[in-house]
């Protein structure tokens, strides 16, 4: 749209055109009061993206304040591109997770690819070198042709971007449920390493300092992407395909290397990714955080399309772009660094002292807005919250106990469920060994990546059981954090901190806002008990299709520190004769379980309980035993219960089996998803030392016959399956579903 065709300020108000941009009548009146006049079209667009939920967190900010964000190792908490945690030796780990849900629902390949690109930029904008990528994905049932299409193209998009830029995708999780049929979730996490002295901030300070634009040229892709991400999906969403950006990983690789060189220069004052809301958010946020203003001449913005208006340039979300603030008079030093990589660093403005965002175009002022009004003073809403009827119904239900006649068939059936089945089809498309630092590849409890130049490693995981959260958001929130910590501990690492991605429905509905509040309450309590502060994160609301919300899905990305590479532990059993222990007892807890969903076709009842004090104690005991060198393998008991955990321990082993005897109620012992449980194998010579350190029950030993045998305590074998049969079912489930013709 040319400037001549843009509606004038009076038309915007009279025709309520601001509503199409996502602003309410009250918000527009507030803008008028802030400016002391009616906003023009460009200013209305700028306010609309900065006041969207995606950029401002206006509906979630009161809830986010509940998270613990401080800790002895935290160097940077929420509010910057990524959180940063000290790991010793003058090094730190920078990490963050973000969503790209709405774009991936419309254009799955580019939506997923640009989600990866954006989170990488968040990490290297802090001055950190990205060393690993993870993801957390949710889709509907794989029997749906539409879901197959989304799944295949999202995975291809993640692989295409990560593989090209040369950062290993080392881990993640994928779950399938009808709740995500129309609204898939695509959350991408990036982890980087940084020296303390290289940490950068996204600030604009120093009057007269130069604002520089680097990276790809600006086009019309992604305009109003932030607003699009703050709406429910509907039949009309397909028309918003232009709001999905297009990524170029090769450009990003050049930008990454140039930025990491530039951060070594003291000429650089501040740096920020042009992510959601592009040039608008990067300039306004940097100025607001620094306590200054920014003035830009939009005629100088590099453009790849002709006739772009100020509105289009400011709202474009073209990828692979960064905004820099550079000391006045030292622009050439920075420009020379970028020129080495074939990139132009273009001066487009300067820092001012009046706390205003002022934009010039063709010699005229086209926008003049207080930066704080766009950033830290954006509206905040305290939404009404109400416990939903379904929750009260579920809480009142009697305990669900499944009836099982054939234990072999039940275990094979669970191994074939896509949420439990092998994700090899997914991670085989990822280059998870590039840079040669990957110690534990995808498929174990957590990925482990070596920290080059040290004897340490990082354990990385993403976790969230959305079904538990639907049944009981507070308990489910606790479990999400606890399970992430469990996975990290099973890998031989001490949990350090988390990043979170809060994926929920429409917060304007009281029952959805209640889910958000309760989930954050549970997560916060778990973070405090387990000593894992929240250092970064993202909120993705309005994940609904035609009024149907996804399950509450607050994904936890956790980083743990392995302080000695010899402590790295994996889930497969290691050798015949080793003793098998289970830590933790089973209760009849099947609400939200894989077994319930498979047998009944739906979930209901109460989620499993979690005692955080017990959880913390068991994790401490297990980590102490691992560090003492008396644990051969460790695996947490999660979806599918103990039977699935044992199957996974033998499937991953080479030529080994297991013979175990379980006591008590067999259905609960084998298939309940009771929390705070682990399967551990121990060499016989370490039996006494292990039993002194850990409260655990000896249930059997590893065999060399490639058969999983499970006996009841009163005699009688209830499960006897060859490892090959289990492996074939487990590995073949997802490829078979993708090949099937509906």
UniProtKB/Swiss-Prot annotation:
Tell me yes or no: is Magnesium among this UniProt entry's keywords: yes
> Which CDD domains does UniProt cross-reference here?
PurL_repeat1, PurL_repeat2
Cite the binding residues for Mg(2+) 1: 98, 538
Q: What pathway is this protein a component of? A: Purine metabolism; IMP biosynthesis via de novo pathway; 5-amino-1-(5-phospho-D-ribosyl)imidazole from N(2)-formyl-N(1)-(5-phospho-D-ribosyl)glycinamide: step 1/2
Binding positions for substrate? Answer: 99-102, 121, 245, 317-319, 540
The residues the record assigns to binding Mg(2+) 2 are 122, 273
| Binding-site positions, ATP | 57, 96, 500, 537
Keyword RNA-binding listed: no
Q: Which reaction does it catalyse?
A: N(2)-formyl-N(1)-(5-phospho-beta-D-ribosyl)glycinamide + L-glutamine + ATP + H2O = 2-formamido-N(1)-(5-O-phospho-beta-D-ribosyl)acetamidine + L-glutamate + ADP + phosphate + H(+)
Describe the subunit structure: Monomer. Part of the FGAM synthase complex composed of 1 PurL, 1 PurQ and 2 PurS subunits.
Tell me its family: Belongs to the FGAMS family.
Q: What is this protein called?
A: Phosphoribosylformylglycinamidine synthase subunit PurL
Query: Which gene underlies this protein?
Result: purL
């Amino acid at each position: 749209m040319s400037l001549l065709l843009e509606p004038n300020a009076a038309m915007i108000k009279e025709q309520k055109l601001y509503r199409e941009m996502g602003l309410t009548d009250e918000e527009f009146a507030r803008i008028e009061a802030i400016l002391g006049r009616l906003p023009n079209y460009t200013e209305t667009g700028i306010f609309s993206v900065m006041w969207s939920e995606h950029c401002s967190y206006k509906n979630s900010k009161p809830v986010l304040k509940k998270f613990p964000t401080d800790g002895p190792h935290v160097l940077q908490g929420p509010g910057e591109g990524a959180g940063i945690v000290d790991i010793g030796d003058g090094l730190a780990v920078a990490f963050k997770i973000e969503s790209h849900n709405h774009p991936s629902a419309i254009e799955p390949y580019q939506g997923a690819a640009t989600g990866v690109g954006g989170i990488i930029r968040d990490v290297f904008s802090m001055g950190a070198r990205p060393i690993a990528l993870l993801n957390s994905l949710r889709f509907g049932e794989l029997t749906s042709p539409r879901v197959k299409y989304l799944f295949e193209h999202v995975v291809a998009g993640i692989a295409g971007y990560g593989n090209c830029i040369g950062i290993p995708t080392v881990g993640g999780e994928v779950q399938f449920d009808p709740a995500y049929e129309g609204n898939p979730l695509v959350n991408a996490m990036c982890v980087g390493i940084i020296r303390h002295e290289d940490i950068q901030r996204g600030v604009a300070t120093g009057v007269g300092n130069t604002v520089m634009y680097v990276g790809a040229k600006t086009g019309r892709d992604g305009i109003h992407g932030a607003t699009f991400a703050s709406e429910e999906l509907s039949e009309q969403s397909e028309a918003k395909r232009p709001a999905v950006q297009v990524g170029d990983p090769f450009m990003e690789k050049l930008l990454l290397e140039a930025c990491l060189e530039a951060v070594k220069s003291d000429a650089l004052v501040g740096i920020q990714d042009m992510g959601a809301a592009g040039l608008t958010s990067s300039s306004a946020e940097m100025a607001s955080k620094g306590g200054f203003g920014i003035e830009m001449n939009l005629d100088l913005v590099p453009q790849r399309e002709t006739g772009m208006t100020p509105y289009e340039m400011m709202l474009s979300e073209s990828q692979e772009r960064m905004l820099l603030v550079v000391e006045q008079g030292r622009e050439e030093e920075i420009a020379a660094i970028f020129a080495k990589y074939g990139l132009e660093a273009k001066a487009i403005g300067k820092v001012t002292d009046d706390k205003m965002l002022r934009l010039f175009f063709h010699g005229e002022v086209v926008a003049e807005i207080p930066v704080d009004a766009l950033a830290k003073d954006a509206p905040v809403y305290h939404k009404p919250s109400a416990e939903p009827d379904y929750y009260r119904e579920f809480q009142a239900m009697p305990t669900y106990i499944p009836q099982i006649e054939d234990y072999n068939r039940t275990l094979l059936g669970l191994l074939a469920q896509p949420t439990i089945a092998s994700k090899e089809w997914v991670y085989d498309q990822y280059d998870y060994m590039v840079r040669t630092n990957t110690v534990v590849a995808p498929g174990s409890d957590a990925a482990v990546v070596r920290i080059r130049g040290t004897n340490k490693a990082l354990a990385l995981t993403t976790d969230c059981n959305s079904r538990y959260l639907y049944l009981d958001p507070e308990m489910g929130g606790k479990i999400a954090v606890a399970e992430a910590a469990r996975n990290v501990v099973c890998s031989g690492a001490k949990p350090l901190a988390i990043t979170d991605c809060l994926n929920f429905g429409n917060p304007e509905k009281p029952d959805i806002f209640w889910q958000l509040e309760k989930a954050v309450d549970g997560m916060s309590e778990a973070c405090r008990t387990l000593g894992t502060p929240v250092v970064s994160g993202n909120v993705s609301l309005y994940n609904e299709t035609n009024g149907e919300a996804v399950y509450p899905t607050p994904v936890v990305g956790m980083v743990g520190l392995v302080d000695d590479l010899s402590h790295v532990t994996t889930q497969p059993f290691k050798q015949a004769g080793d003793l098998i222990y289970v830590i933790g007892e089973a209760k009849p807890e099947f609400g939200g379980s894989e077994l319930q969903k498979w047998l009944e076709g739906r979930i209901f009842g109460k989620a499993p309980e979690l005692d955080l004090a017990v959880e913390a104690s068991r994790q401490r005991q297990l980590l102490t035993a691992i560090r003492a060198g008396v644990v051969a393998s460790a695996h947490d008991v999660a979806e599918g219960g103990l039977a699935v955990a044992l199957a996974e321990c033998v499937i991953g082993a080479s030529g080994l089996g297991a013979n175990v005897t379980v006591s008590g109620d067999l259905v609960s012992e084998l298939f309940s998803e009771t929390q705070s449980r682990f399967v551990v194998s121990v060499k016989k010579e370490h039996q006494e030392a292990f039993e002194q350190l850990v409260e655990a029950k000896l249930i059997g030993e590893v065999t060399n016959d490639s058969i999983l045998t499970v006996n009841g305590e009163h005699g009688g074998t209830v499960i006897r399956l060859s490892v090959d049969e289990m492996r074939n079912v487990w590995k073949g489930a997802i490829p078979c579903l993708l090949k099937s013709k509906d």
